[in-house]
From Swiss-Prot:
It comes from Persephonella marina (strain DSM 14350 / EX-H1). Required for maturation of 30S ribosomal subunits. It is found in: Cytoplasm. It comes from the Bacteria. GO terms for cellular component: cytosol. Keywords: Cytoplasm, Ribosome biogenesis. CDD domains: YlxS_C. GO terms for biological process: ribosomal small subunit assembly; translation. Disulfide bonds: none annotated. Belongs to the RimP family. This is Ribosome maturation factor RimP.
């Protein structure tokens, strides 16, 4: 049931996101206690409170019309955060061009941590530019990856 709701919300969000030039990062539907539907969106030019409000108003109205969640719930729409932990492969495409920190399972060039600019993904590799050099990291060698915020 939870996954069905998430999939239906994704479908409903797609035209709204495209209209506003936004990308969907993640959807969480938590049912412990009062249910919470969390939608994380990303604007490559910088996610604003206006982006979140715009999506919240529109998806909230659509959800009310569809009566997709038949109980009282809380809707939260937000940016993914400055130092978000990347949870799925698609996020490496979404956050291309952002600073990233990757903790490795096995060292690459004697390093356990790679920090640099995310260049994207190719096949089963993540490409990071670290100190002017391109580093290819196999997905299976990534223990953890987070966006990095540089002050």
């Amino acid at each position: 049931m939870k996954q069905e709701i998430i999939e239906k919300v994704k479908e409903m969000l797609q035209p709204l996101l495209e209209e506003r030039g936004l990308k969907l990062v993640d959807i969480e539907y938590v049912t412990e206690g009062k249910p919470v539907l969390r939608i994380y969106i990303y604007n490559p030019e910088g996610t604003t409170i206006e982006d979140c409000e715009w999506i919240s108003r529109r998806i909230g109205a659509l959800l009310d019309i569809e009566d997709l969640i038949p109980v009282s719930y809380t809707l939260e729409v937000s940016s993914p955060g400055l130092e978000r932990k990347l949870k799925n492969v698609e996020e490496y495409d979404i956050f291309k061009g952002r600073d990233i920190k990757i903790v490795l399972k096995e060292p690459v060039d004697k390093k356990n941590v790679i920090k640099g600019v995310l260049k994207g993904r190719e096949d089963n590799n993540i490409i990071v530019e670290e100190e002017g050099e391109e580093v290819r990291i196999p997905l299976e060698n990534i223990a953890r990856a987070n966006l990095e915020f540089k002050h």
